[in-house]
Amino acid sequence: MQLTSYTDYSLRLLLYLALQPKHKLSSVKQVADIYRISYNHLTKVTHELGKLGLIETIKGRNGGIRLAKEPEEINIGEVVKQTEDNLELVECFNRETNTCILNPACRLKGVLHEALAAYLQVLEQYTVKDLVLNEDDLRALLQFKTTEQ
């Protein structure tokens, strides 16, 4: 299973913001530049994470973005479920579009459902805080300036 770039960018944005001092605002452009990802795509991600209550967006000249919750309150599994638009691993997961003739007797579908549930269960064991415990390494890779720490 491959996560969409939308979910990938969502998680990366949350990690970046978790590494910031508590009330420091960051700009979407700054984050997009550091990660070398599309500003427009990251803007959409930012808007959605704001609607989900995960980040706070402040408009205006001195505005920016920051986490709206503590990093330990943001569950990775929940973020993935909220940002992935399709967790259907195979066609038969969708009753409306399923055309597979094996569906009535297929055991693979059950195995894949079980695998997806296990995947999500593992993700649900982690929060954003868990993913930034190696904060010094991450800061170095993201080239945080000493004054930002």
Swiss-Prot record:
Disulfide links within the chain: none
Keywords carried by this UniProt record: 2Fe-2S, DNA-binding, Iron, Iron-sulfur, Metal-binding, Transcription, Transcription regulation
Gene3D superfamilies in the record: Winged helix-like DNA-binding domain superfamily/Winged helix DNA-binding domain
InterPro entries, A to Z: TR_Rrf2-type_CS (IPR030489), Tscrpt_reg_Rrf2 (IPR000944), WH-like_DNA-bd_sf (IPR036388), WH_DNA-bd_sf (IPR036390)
Top-level division of the source organism's lineage: Bacteria
Cofactors (names): [2Fe-2S] cluster
Binding site for [2Fe-2S] cluster: C92, C100, C106
DNA-binding region: 28-51
A cellular component term, taken from the record's GO annotations: cytosol
Transcription among keywords: yes
An example molecular function term from Gene Ontology annotations: DNA-binding transcription factor activity
Positions of the HTH rrf2-type domain: 2-133
Cofactor binding note from Swiss-Prot or TrEMBL: Binds 1 [2Fe-2S] cluster per subunit.
Pfam families noted in UniProt: Rrf2 (PF02082)
Function: Nitric oxide-responsive transcriptional regulator.
Stated name of the protein: HTH-type transcriptional regulator NsrR
